[in-house]
Amino acid sequence: RRGGRVVVKQAQDLKQGDKLIKFELPIIEGTEVFNSAYTNGFYSGDGCFYKGKGFVYLYHDKQKLLDRMQNVKKVHTDENQNRQTVYFKEGTLKDKYFVPLDNYTIKSRLEWLAGICDSDGTVSRNGLNESLQISSTQLTFLQEIQLMLQTLGVTSTINEACEEGWRDMPLNDGSGETGKFFCQKAYRLLINSNSLFKLSELGFE
């Protein structure tokens, strides 16, 4: 938009001072059902794969989420670390960074999103407004999630969360101590309050 007039331009023809008109993304319904969508979403955020076995750790309050997990093979409880290790049946998990797109039903995509948000999401509050952040060292993975959100009619943004470098992190051995670990560069995907409201109208919880 320039001077009150609407002009159609290609991206490479945009100039400083041009303003983009607001638009609504369409909501696309797919037909394929993702039977273990929540579990795969959680696995994408906090899952591990070792010697042919996929599993996740549930610490503290997150152990309440065990009832939402599907295709569980066995659960190992470590009371010293207040942790459950949940192992899944072979062949029931997609690749760790798989993201369901518009060929899957809206319900399947929302359940997958709930899974990764429960494992790797952070809610930020500013007064009455809430926003949701998903962090990852895998930029392409976050871009795939951003694309999935667009198929649900929702916009989001991606920015840098932190640079790579050495940081103090928990040793994860039950001691409560920390140690120096080299961390990769991290990114975060941000979903603002308006977009969260749209997702809630679709059934996201």
What are these regions (language model features)?
Residues 1-205:
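Internal intein/HINT superfamily modules and their associated LAGLIDADG
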